[in-house]
Amino acid sequence: MSRVSALEMAFSLMLESPRFVPSEAAGFNAQLHRKKIFSDLMAAFNFEVIVETGTFIGNTTGYLTTTTQARIFTCEANRTFLSLAKSRLSGLANIHFTQGDSRQFLRTLFASELLPAKLSKPVFFYLDAHWHDDLPLGDEIQIIAENLKDFVIMVDDFQVPNEPGYGWDDYGGKNVLNLTTFQSCFRQWKLLPFFPSLPAPQETGGRRGCVALAPEGRMSDKLRECKSLRIAQE
């Protein structure tokens, strides 16, 4: 997105929604089943730290901080969008904003706030920093998996197998958010992929696809128990 386009979008969004207001339409693309997935994961793991890449204007950030007691660390590459998110979310507690590349953001967190000695519970990662040709998802997953044993990742805009009604991001070539592109990455880091159990026509809001990832073993066993999710064919 060009700087001019970003400024135009930011100005329009500020006029339409100058402050974050909790509602069914706020966060996770206004998708109620997506929120159910997160609620199930929160009940299973009681996350104390949530990390988001791709703040955009802060709707999901606001949802996360108003529905949990977790500390939220969020990163946005576009300075204009980050400024807008900060303005819309001012007054809300436990949000730590960073402007910059999501990969460096994660590396910095693992050298500071995400040191094992500071963590008593698994960490939830919401990865939504994929608007550009330089798709950071594979690197983000590698950084997380190299540094933590207990975590859950949710990737927005990911293709849901056999459910074409859920949208996904396709930037051409190998820059497609689907299993064809990322299955080898998941296998390399021994992550099991889970998808929404709800058929796409029954979802609300943007009806964007997602995948939830957890390390094989104890973590993935808990995801198997979440009725809002289904395991990909193994």
What do the predicted segments below correspond to?
Residues 1-124, 129-234:
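A short alpha-helical cap/connector motif
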